[in-house]
Amino acid sequence: MSESPLTIVIVDEDPVFRLGLITVLGRETGVQVLGEGETLDDLRQQLETLAPSILLIDPQFPRRSQSAWPLLRQLSSAYPQVKICLLTASLEYDQLLAAKTQGIAAYFPKGTAIADLVTGLKQVHFGQTCWPSLQTVNAPPLSLWEKLIWPLFRDGLGQIEQSLQQVQKSLQVPSLSDFDRLFWRGRERELKFAQWLVRNLLPQRLKTWHKATNILTATTTVLPPSPPSPRRSGVRTITLRPPSNLTALGQILQQMPLQVENLTAIPLELDILQPLKRQELLSLGQQQLETTINELKALRITPAQLPENCLSIVAEMWRSLSLTFFGKYCQPKSEFSLEQIQSLLEVYQPIICREKLVKIPFVVPLFHHLLFGEPLVVNQKAYPLGSTEAQQYSDLYAQNLVIQLANSTMVFILNYFADHEAIKLALYEYSMLSSRQVARFRNDLAWYYQFSRYWLNPKQIFESQHTLLYLTPAGIVTTQVYAPRQQELTQLRAVPWFVTIVLECRDALSPRVRSVIEFVGNGLVFLLTQVVGRAIGLVGKGIIQGIGNTWQESRSQQKRSN
């Protein structure tokens, strides 16, 4: 029997109940209340810093969220050394079944006598479980027929639910056409009707099992990150990568499906990668951005130093990301060493800076905002740190930076190792393994580079816009953001400059040409309908009258002959 003290952390949204419970438990011998809280931040901080033996929590916490049951499942896996006990109002059978199935150590209804509560907590502390309402949980076992049909219903409902999620993600795509949206809406109605029909065909006891399964497999609640604090050994964090200021990118990467699609009309270097490798490269890019921000904070770089060193910082981010990704997946140990890869990166760095990295917009404002807390200026409006608009635009800029860094990493691989067999097998999609497909992919990229250089980029400079890539749960999409680009416009020469002149001439002439075409078109319509049309009508009328007269004369002759 363990002689370690019984330590408890209490989490409940009712402060009066929490205070009374702490006071009563504090009088008990061998029981120590280490902490208490009412928010997700409090819960995470208490578990990481105090490492209690028991977490006493209300499963209805937090009441403003959809469900705390997935949170309990996550806590159980992230902190296996902490035993979770429920202290709440009476639960339904399916909720009790879910709690017992996922390994909750004890359940105490609110109103349980303090002596019984302390006794149950001590039993849990010594490795036992405590279910005062156990007789209500143990329902009669399923019959043979129910055991046979239950997997069919469960798997069918699971497939319907997965299909519904895919349809809903498809409906979230901004560029979806009206016809496609109508199609997916119909598909959604069909799936919901099938789901309702299957659920109504379930026997009553299997409905209870299904509800319990839904509780166990609901979407996991992600605990928000807390400030760094001393932690005891053996305690693990709940979130895989606390994304600090870049919350949206981290959340999307965690929620993103494996089949991340390029939903833009732009060919991206990432398109050649396998879905898992594509997602991994984006995740590494996010981590590299976070690492760079932390390093710059540690170096205490000043706002005056940042603009002149920004390109070097981004280049170092690209170099580190490329080396990490290549070393993790692409290094054929028999042919290349990391030293050789580093030398190739150093040679290629000026080229990638000139062709790709220097063109990434809003990097300096993003770093100023994240490092020094300066307001983010968008459309001549300054949004302070912490505001909703500043968070949205900083997330957008960060996502575009990460995606462009990932694309630049693939540019390096495609230029030096495009046809290397080991690298193709490790990274490329199966449909892109042949040399012909790789050559076609590279040619498509090369054509787009030239098209962008001589048409798209001058056009966007003239229109004072930047095209940014960002992530959605369905995939990668684009958006247009306004920004003054007068200095770039004055620096255009040769073909790009001529493109702006063509656009300006088109803007100047098109309204006049349109009006002339409209006038001529109206004249032609009048001529064809009022003149030619009437003339043709008169001719047709004469022909019909002639046919009628001839027919009448023939009838008259027939009557006379008769």
Curated annotation (Swiss-Prot):
Spell out the Pfam families in the cross-references. Answer: DUF3685 (PF12452), Response_reg (PF00072)
Q: Which InterPro entries match?
A: CheY-like_superfamily, RcsB_transcriptional_reg, Sig_transdc_resp-reg_receiver, Uncharacterised_Ycf55_cyanobac, UPF_Ycf55
Q: What are the disulfide bonds?
A: none
Q: Enumerate the Gene Ontology biological process terms.
A: phosphorelay signal transduction system
Coiled-coil region(s): none
> What are the residue boundaries of the Response regulatory domain, all occurrences included?
7-125
Q: Which PROSITE patterns match?
A: RESPONSE_REGULATORY
Which PANTHER family does this entry report, sorted A to Z? HTH-TYPE TRANSCRIPTIONAL REGULATOR YHJB-RELATED
Family from the record: Belongs to the ycf55 family.
Report what the protein is called. Answer: Ycf55-like protein
The protein's organism comes out as Synechocystis sp. (strain ATCC 27184 / PCC 6803 / Kazusa)
